[in-house]
From Swiss-Prot:
InterPro entries: BEN_domain, BTB/POZ_dom, SKP1/BTB/POZ_sf, ZnFinger_BTB_dom_contain. Residues 242-251 have a biased composition (Polar residues). It is found in: Nucleus; Cytoplasm. Residues 360-457 form the BEN domain. Homooligomer; mediated by the BTB domain. Interacts with HDAC3 and HDAC4. Interacts (via BTB domain) with CUL3, PSMD7 and RCOR1. Functions as a transcriptional repressor. Seems to function as a transcriptional corepressor in neuronal cells through recruitment of HDAC3 and HDAC4. Contributes to tumor progression, and tumor cell proliferation and survival. This may be mediated at least in part through repressing transcriptional activity of GADD45GIP1. Required for recruiting the proteasome from the nucleus to the cytoplasm and dendritic spines. Involved in the acute behavioral and neurological responses to cocaine and amphetamines. One of its GO terms (biological process) is negative regulation of DNA-templated transcription. Ubiquitously expressed with higher expression in the brain, kidney and liver, and at lower levels in heart, lung and testes. This is Nucleus accumbens-associated protein 1.
Length: 514
């Protein structure tokens, strides 16, 4: 019997995919063009069908050489996922992980949905916020191909006749990460420069609003700059990203410190850091990302979610000051927070008008409720998050929830997660209001609100007692009167005790006596 010889070449499949990726970058042997909002991405049908169930079903039903994706898909997100299909790696800015997850869910890429969700949870946890970008992990500044340099692959030695076309794919108006890249790159350069101690690493340059405006001018997006702001992620690999705990505000701090009687501060809440000033362009760019939420309910119409009725909010959060007479934000508040709120709040309108909190989420809140949230919060983004969550979730809902929109509580499986669409819409709205607002802080605040709600609900279970002389006409008082006689001096003692309890500080609260 003839012997069988076997030979194995390690990583041959990876080498083939690497060559296919280089061919894609050069536009060679590509048999399909995927159009995303006017941007054409050349690719190979076999690779897309092997990576995505969405493309596999699409190619089975259509042989067209041009495929156009729905408007909900963003070009930058598809570019990153297309790169993943060829390399198995994702490269993204911190904070864009939700957008990547929703894009992968729409394209039905199970690997990103399963492994990526677990990885992004680790990135968003407070324990991972302290992991910084070490000097030896700083991105290389060697010239590479426009897209391959984000993946860490060597540049192709063959000429790239379609480099200009690939570059145009990066010139996106909807996603601009140059300011963040510049800030994080300066941070890593300071750490690599051997700054003495923690003080040196924390003293990072602040960029004012004019600097951001200059960096946001339409220009080709340099991927060498963009890689400084992203953590190149191998699925299932280790975390390596810029330190989020050492980030500073890119704008000058502006605390809302009005001492007038109409001050919009709420002293009952903790002091919060001042937010950053933004522009309408920023809001429109971020709203472009929010359209991805419509893909949470693929194949069906997303259910419309509205805030709680005003009276319910007042019952659960009596400290919220309602000002129904306001048709637009006060000028004094606008001077402090700038253009970081919902665009329609700057124009006069009906207080009962329902506004979509974030474009594409189908999450609605009335103009009056949203305005009250901003008026109560002022410049404090954490208070704004609490106000918005209280507008959508009543106390009982918070008490029976675990504070996240991802999974049930590990301590008590009966506590279900909050509505993920509402939770993420509120989070992204607050991130637009304060770009330095970390998701780990938001999760901690939501969990804290659920804990406080459980405490309040638990206190409400305690029975409220009444003095015997206040309970008249009921069976219990008649039973007492039939079985025993209440002495006049004892009644006078109870009456004097009640008076002292209302006037003194050590007596029972008025709520218990009522």
């Amino acid at each position: 019997m003839a012997q069988t010889l076997q030979m194995e070449i390690p990583n041959f499949g990876n080498s083939i995919l690497e060559c296919l990726n280089e061919q894609r970058l050069q536009g060679l042997y590509c048999d399909v063009s995927v159009v995303v909002k006017g941007h054409a991405f050349k690719a190979h049908r076999a690779v897309l069908a092997a990576s995505s169930s969405y493309f596999r079903d699409l190619f089975n039903s259509s042989r067209s050489a041009v495929v156009e994706l729905p408007a909900a898909v963003q070009p930058q997100s598809f570019q990153q996922i297309l790169t993943f299909c060829y390399t198995g790696r994702l490269s993204m800015n911190m904070g864009d992980q939700f957008l990547l997850i929703y894009t992968a869910g729409f394209l039905q890429i199970q690997e990103i949905m399963e492994k990526g969700t677990e990885f992004f949870l680790k990135v968003s946890s407070p324990s991972c916020d302290s992991q910084g970008l070490h000097p030896e992990e700083a991105p290389s500044s060697e010239p590479q191909s426009p897209v391959a340099q984000t993946l860490g692959w060597p540049a192709c030695s063959t000429p790239l006749p379609l480099v200009s076309r690939v570059k145009t794919e990066q010139e996106l108006d909807s996603v601009q990460c140059t300011p963040m890249a510049k800030r994080l790159w300066d941070s890593s350069q300071k750490e690599a420069g051997g700054s003495g101690g923690n003080n040196g690493s924390r003293k990072m340059a602040k960029f004012s609003t004019p600097d951001l405006a200059l960096n946001r001018m339409p220009q080709p997006l340099s991927m060498a700059t963009a890689t400084a702001a992203v953590a190149v992620v191998a699925v299932g690999g280790c975390v390596s990203g810029p330190s989020m705990s050492e980030r500073t505000s890119p704008g000058t701090s502006s605390a809302y410190t009005s001492d007038s009687p109409s001050s919009y501060h709420n002293e009952e809440d903790e002091e919060e850091d001042a937010g950053e000033e933004g522009t309408d362009e920023q809001y429109r760019q971020i709203c472009n990302m929010y359209t991805m939420y419509s893909m949470l309910n693929v194949g069906q119409t997303a259910e419309k979610v509205e805030a709680l009725p005003e009276q319910v909010v007042l019952e659960s959060r009596s400290r919220i000051r309602v000002r129904q007479d306001l048709a637009s934000l006060p000028a004094e508040l606008i001077n402090q927070i700038g253009n970081r709120c919902h665009p329609k709040l700057y124009d006069e309108g009906d207080p009962s008008e329902k506004l979509e909190l974030v474009t594409g989420t189908n999450v609605y809140i009335t103009r009056a409720q949203l305005m009250n949230c901003h008026v109560s919060a002022g410049t404090r983004h954490k208070v704004l998050l609490r106000r918005l969550l209280a507008s959508f979730f009543d106390r009982n809902t918070l008490a029976n929830s675990c504070g996240t929109g991802i999974r049930s509580s590990t301590n008590d499986p009966r506590r279900k997660p909050l509505d993920s669409r509402v939770l993420h819409a509120v989070k992204y709205y607050c991130q637009n209001f304060a770009p330095n607002f970390k998701e780990s802080e938001m999760n901690a605040i939501a969990a804290d609100m659920c804990t406080n709600a459980r405490r309040v609900v638990r206190k409400s279970w305690l029975p409220k007692t009444k003095p015997l002389h206040l309970v008249e006409g009921d069976n219990y008082s008649s039973f007492i009167s039939d079985t025993c006689k209440i002495e006049p001096d004892m009644m006078s003692m109870e009456h004097s005790f009640e008076t002292a309890s209302h006037d003194g500080e050590a007596g029972p609260s008025a709520e218990v006596l009522q």
